[in-house]
Amino acid sequence: MNKIIAANQTLTSEAVSEGHPDKIADQISDAILDEILKEDKNAKVACEVIIAQNLVVIAGEINSPVKKNIDIKEVAKNIIKDIGYTNIDYGLDYKTITVIDAIGNQSRDIINAIEKKGSNALGAGDQGIIFGYACDETKNFLPAPYELANSILKKASNLRKSGAIKWLRPDSKSQVTIEYDKNRNPVKIKNIIVSHQHHPNISQKLIQQTIIEEIIKPTVQDKSMLDENTAYCINPSGNFVIGGPTGDTGLTGRKIIADSYGGFARHGGGAYSGKDATKVDRSAAYMARYIAKNMVAAGISKEFELQLAYAIGIENPISIQITGGINDPKYANKILNFIVNNFDLTPNGIIEKLKLKQPIYLKTCTYGHFGKNEFEWEKLDFVKKIQTALKK
């Protein structure tokens, strides 16, 4: 990676709210996963959702005896209600939706590959390329445009749900462009885009004024990054009344960049939501983030990107590589040796370290999977050990 950034170069990230159709699908997938894990911590789950108009189709594979105990249709309805889709005029109504349950059983071939007979070891649930990333741009070790894009939508969601801004509806997106100096420090916010669903009888002028003054500006912590040249694009398409799945079909796993690092890091292509922790697309991505965050917090580099690669049925990664943040090959090899010798990167090791058999996943899947400090992969408990072994 090692991005070369010239003075006055801009970088951009986007985010989506919990009411975006793809995020509705992610939340239903992860809510079902959580309900299964509450009764069976060893369940194998791959849950996919498509949502269009007033129809929700839940598919995928679940291997667990408790599957029959879960009212999957009720789980989906409760998620939609909690998001705020309580009226068909909003684009979806939990009271009238049709839910189709098309979940099957996990392939016996895959089960046999993951679970080794006569052993407690777990093989990887699939092949995959996984990246973890961190940088020093924010206190959460995330890219500044990405964190701000998410923070704006979280603020809007809070104001909508509290009733402070009654004409906001659930569906929304944001995009933030920030200017960087030659030392790769964010210095100015160049552009902020917010597209937010709204009640039909609200003027565009009021929408623009409210979103800028009551949502965006209070969210920007460093006011010096805003100036007279900052451009605000609020609902640039005009009316945004038709939203939710009436306006756009939603699908689990379609917001993988918004889920991770907002385009600042590579992505192997595997989505997170709806997958139990034997799926390394998810669990190894969390572990790679944990390692990268501790490396940056330890002062090893301003940014750090780690690639892991797995083969189905095999415990250990088949490849580990530092793909960003370290320019010295000898130092990179030293760091790699440290990673191999100090972090258990098998599925079992990751699951145990990050406590991934708990029903935590619904909380992960909105406004990014990273930067939420209640989760194990965000802890900075390896910093001192890294500094002792690796600090130049």
From Swiss-Prot:
Binding site for L-methionine: 61, 106, 248, 279
Enzyme class: transferase
Entry keyword set: ATP-binding, Cytoplasm, Magnesium, Metal-binding, Nucleotide-binding, One-carbon metabolism, Potassium, Transferase
UniProt remark on cofactor binding: Binds 2 divalent ions per subunit. Binds 1 potassium ion per subunit.
Pathway terms, separated by semicolons: Amino-acid biosynthesis; S-adenosyl-L-methionine biosynthesis; S-adenosyl-L-methionine from L-methionine: step 1/1
Region spans: Flexible loop: 106-116
Main location class: cytoplasm
E.C. numbers: 2.5.1.6
Binding site for ATP: 20, 171-173, 248, 254-255, 271, 275
Localization per record: Cytoplasm
GO MF, any single term: ATP binding
Pfam annotation, one family: S-AdoMet_synt_N
Taxonomic superkingdom: Bacteria
Alphabetical GO biological process terms: one-carbon metabolic process; S-adenosylmethionine biosynthetic process
Keyword RNA-binding: no
Cellular component terms (Gene Ontology): cytoplasm
Binding site for Mg(2+): 22
Cofactor dependence: Mg(2+); K(+)
Catalytic reactions of this protein: L-methionine + ATP + H2O = S-adenosyl-L-methionine + phosphate + diphosphate
Sites where the protein binds K(+): 48
Assembly information from the UniProt record: Homotetramer; dimer of dimers.
PANTHER family: S-ADENOSYLMETHIONINE SYNTHETASE (PTHR11964)
NCBIfam families: metK (TIGR01034)
Job of this protein: Catalyzes the formation of S-adenosylmethionine (AdoMet) from methionine and ATP. The overall synthetic reaction is composed of two sequential steps, AdoMet formation and the subsequent tripolyphosphate hydrolysis which occurs prior to release of AdoMet from the enzyme.
Protein family according to the UniProt entry: Belongs to the AdoMet synthase family.
Record's protein name: S-adenosylmethionine synthase
Species per Swiss-Prot/TrEMBL record: Borreliella burgdorferi (strain ATCC 35210 / DSM 4680 / CIP 102532 / B31) (Borrelia burgdorferi)
